[in-house]
Regions:
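Short beta-strand/turn micro-motifs composed of small residues
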Residues: 111, 151, 176
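Residue-level detector of alpha-helix initiation sites
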Residues: 90-91, 154-155, 179
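Segments forming oxygen-rich coordination pockets for charged ligands
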Residues: 1-128, 142-145, 224-244
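Short amphipathic alpha-helix with an adjacent loop that forms part of the alpha/beta core around
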Residues: 133-143
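Short, solvent-exposed amphipathic alpha-helical segments in soluble enzyme
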Residues: 99-105, 163-166, 189-190
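Rossmann-fold NAD(P) dinucleotide-binding segment
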Residues: 156-169
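Adenosine-phosphate binding glycine-rich loop
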Residues: 169, 174-244
């Protein structure tokens, strides 16, 4: 059974114009917002991250991306579109951008090396040939953004990782072995990042499914990102992923 709520919008009826304007402003600013309507009293309000009796229910709806009823309240979810910023136009990135788009993400590639990030290798994709930290600042990052670093080159990966750690991205994954990550951790600590910051990094990247080929590693990355999005209580763990 499907329940559909239809509201007129006009003078003296339906949602207040100010509420709709505020909703539109939040959407434009990429702020997750729930439009809440009590179907008994027809009270209406917007729920973001401010304290509200429906906050817990709204947060659960944000994570599931599903609107629905909580008692007499209809909660309409307005989440910003998902984005994935991939640093490093390497072989793994080719299947990953396709999988990301199928999963509902807007993928963007960052690689200053034009021979790697070429239109021939990534037809129709958004490619920024800029230094990663500058590119990430230009693109902007928020709680609906996943960042994946794949270059295996600290000169390119580290600036992107540092920029991502200063943001609210919901996922940050980095290619490299456990040994590579240990060296990365030392560099980040020297740069002033604490244990809580560094613990946000998923490395070695990807779910531990024994992936070997670029496509398989892309699948493992997509699986891990999905888990982090849908089960935000999960924390990064070191795995035996063969991403040398």
């Amino acid at each position: 059974r499907i329940r559909v709520m239809v509201e007129p919008l006009g003078v003296g009826q339906g949602p207040w114009v100010e509420t709709i304007q505020a909703l539109a402003a939040d959407r434009a600013a990429r702020v997750p917002v729930v439009y809440a309507v009590n179907t008994e009293t027809w009270d209406r309000r917007l729920i973001t991250d401010a304290p509200d009796p429906l906050s817990d229910a709204a947060q659960a709806r944000f994570h599931s991306d599903k609107s629905g009823f909580e008692g007499d309240w209809f909660l309409g979810v307005h989440n910003p579109p998902l984005r994935m910023i991939i640093v490093g136009a390497v072989h793994i990135a080719q299947p990953l951008v396709q999988m990301a788009r199928l999963a509902g993400y807007d993928p963007m590639l960052v690689d200053p090396r034009e021979a790697f990030g070429s239109a021939a290798r990534f037809p129709g994709e958004t490619i920024l040939h800029e230094w990663p930290d500058h590119a990430l600042e230009e693109l902007g990052m928020d709680a609906r953004t996943a960042v994946v670093t794949l270059t295996h080159d600290p000169k390119l990966d580290d600036p992107a990782i540092m920029a991502a750690l200063r943001s609210q991205v919901f996922y940050l994954g980095c290619l490299g072995s456990t040994r590579t990550h240990a060296k990365r951790v030392a560099r980040l600590a020297e740069a002033g990042f604490d244990e809580a910051d560094i613990a946000r990094i998923h490395a070695p990247i990807g779910a531990d499914i024994g992936a070997k080929s670029p496509a398989e590693i892309a699948i493992s990355i997509m699986a891990q990102i999905t888990e982090r999005l849908r089960r935000p209580e999960t924390r990064p763990q070191a795995t035996a992923q063969a991403a040398e």
